Amino acid sequence: NIDKLPPIDVVTISHAHYDHLDLPSLKKLYKINKDTLFLVPMNLGKLLKSAGVKNVVEMNWWDTITIKESLITFVPVHHWSSRTPFDKNETLWGGWWFETDLSKLLHLGDTGYTYDFATIHNELGPPDVAFIPIGAYEPRSLMKNSHLNPEESIQAAIDLKTNKAIGMHWGTFMLTDEAVL
């Protein structure tokens, strides 16, 4: 129940796809806590604002914002963005790097395999924990450029030199042809 959540300081959105951006949920979150800050990819803010969510900051790749002594950086990944058949790549997409004095966390959102993983490591260092997507990867002929399969997810963890990798983006929505893990 969304009403039972504690106050939320920040919500990050990776891209516009419906499985990553549920407007009714964001509207409810904003309604119960108008102080929540919504960090979104460039050009996606107008969608949230049109739904009544006003506390929105758009970010470009490598933009960093400081919130309560935490650094949050929007990082590039290999994906795409749209909400309709007519708005492909009109908004940006990406992952989120969270850094405090105690730890570094990386959430990759959706991504295909890319040299950006090594670049993220070179720019920001190794994450203590990386949330790496492993779902919606079959058939490879269609999904290779936008979703990691399990083997590529392992290579992403190696490229990032993360201390711990946690697989995500599987078993929630039946999006493609792979078997449920």
Model-flagged regions — what are they?
Residues 1-39, 55, 125-131:
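Active-site metal-binding motif and surrounding structural segment of the metallo-beta-lactamase
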